[in-house]
Curated annotation (Swiss-Prot):
Cofactor: heme b
Membrane topology (UniProt): Multi-pass membrane protein
The protein, known as: Cytochrome b
Misc: Heme 1 (or BL or b562) is low-potential and absorbs at about 562 nm, and heme 2 (or BH or b566) is high-potential and absorbs at about 566 nm.
Keywords annotated in UniProt: Electron transport, Heme, Iron, Membrane, Metal-binding, Mitochondrion, Mitochondrion inner membrane, Respiratory chain, Transmembrane, Transmembrane helix, Transport, Ubiquinone
Gene3D superfamilies to which the protein is assigned, alphabetical: Cytochrome Bc1 Complex, Chain C
Organism the protein comes from: Simalia amethistina (Amethystine python)
Transmembrane segments: 25-45, 69-90, 105-125, 170-190, 218-238, 280-300, 312-332, 339-358
Single GO biological process annotation from the record: mitochondrial electron transport, ubiquinol to cytochrome c
Length: 371
């Protein structure tokens, strides 16, 4: 493996011949990041971080700025595409055992957390009704921290409630964090290319490698083209598909929406939070739903790396996928039966998958007579 990183990244990188389409999502994520930074810059030029003007400045961008509507929709829907790609990317890592490359996995999960923080701050910026109340509910979870909670919340808000200082600092954070994401992405790619990608069989690919360019670069380009086509179809014909109707009204602290919920890509974590009636317990479960991903490399006990030849793990993996979808759906519903029970069952199943990894590994070793 050559150690000239710049050359290695562009073309000379030796890659296994048998990596499938599931390995394309890294380059798609890089494209999403570039798109978000570019559209975000043009939006920031016209945006005003003031509670009296923020909502009006978004209307000004969509109505008066040339192609402002396209920039705004590309940025909002691009965020959804970003999360679709990152969730598939993580699912592929779980299925094919990519997490055994520990440094790459750890940097990737850190990237996910940074991305989620950036997206949350961005959701608050339009200062719509749902933006305001989602920010109030989520930041208010800090008060669940014993002793420090109230002080931390006041410090984050810049006052005793969400107000102008909160919006200003959220805009500053939303602007600066993408640069942290770019730095972490570079680190992620360098760490990956130290060891090299895994492959669907989980075998050592050193005996059969080909240059990344032109073989895999053209394969990446196909899916990239399809993603951009899909993105522009949504932007052109269904621009409000991911928007909440409440967010078309300006934030009003005196009127609470009937059902407060964040963007769809946070709903699985929000569903886990809501499934626990205790505030501190819910906040801990919310944090653990992401943090548990850090533990996976240390829980792998199977002798085979991917799930390709491990039927029990496959069953649990697809249960996790269906659980993720179900909990996302349940979190869009009001807090009433049967949705409370569905959320609690799916939250339990979600954590069961991660806790069952070592047990399933041992069982599969026994089934295959591997000592």
């Amino acid at each position: 493996m050559p150690h000239h990183y710049i050359l290695t990244l562009f073309g000379l990188l030796p890659v296994a011949t048998n990596i499938s389409t599931w390995w394309n999502f890294g380059s798609m994520l890089l494209t999403c990041l570039a798109l978000q930074v570019l559209t975000g810059f043009f939006l920031a030029v016209h945006y005003t971080a003031n509670i009296n003007l923020a909502f009006s400045s978004i209307i000004h961008i969509t109505r008066d700025v040339p192609y402002g509507w396209m920039m705004q929709n590309l940025h909002a829907i691009g965020a959804s595409m970003f999360f679709i790609c990152i969730y598939i990317h993580i699912a592929r890592g779980l299925y094919y055992g990519s997490y055994l490359n520990k440094e790459t996995w750890m940097s990737g999960i850190t990237l996910l957390i940074t991305l989620m923080a950036t997206a949350f701050f961005g959701y608050v910026l339009p200062w719509g009704q749902m933006s305001f109340w989602a920010a109030t509910v989520i930041t208010n979870l800090l008060t669940a921290i014993p002793y420090l909670g109230t002080s931390l919340t006041t410090w984050l808000w810049g006052g005793f409630a969400i107000n102008d200082p909160t919006l200003t600092r959220f805009f500053a954070l939303h602007f600066i964090l993408p640069f942290a994401i770019i730095s972490l992405s570079s680190l992620h790619i360098i760490l990956l290319h130290e060891e090299g990608s895994s492959n669907p069989l989980g075998t050592n690919p050193d005996i059969d490698k080909i240059p990344f360019h032109p073989y895999h670069s053209y394969k990446d380009l196909l899916l990239l083209t399809l993603m951009i086509l899909f993105l522009f179809i949504i932007v052109s014909f269904f621009p409000d598909i991911f928007n909440d109707p409440d967010n078309f009204s300006k934030a009003n602290p005196l009127v609470t929406p009937q059902h407060i919920k964040p963007e769809w890509y946070f709903l699985f974590a929000y569903g886990i939070l809501r499934s626990i009636p205790n505030k501190l317990g819910g906040a801990l479960a919310l944090v653990m739903s992401i943090m548990i991903l850090f533990t996976i490399p240390f829980m792998h006990t199977a002798h085979l790396r991917p799930m390709t030849f491990r039927p029990l793990s496959q069953l649990m993996f697809w249960t996790l996928v269906s659980t993720f979808i179900t909990i996302t759906w349940a979190a869009t519903k009001p807090v009433e039966p049967p949705y409370i029970m569905i959320s609690q069952m799916t939250a339990t199943l979600y954590f069961t998958f991660f806790l069952s990894i070592p047990i399933l590994g041992w069982m599969e070793n026994k089934m295959m007579n591997i000592p």
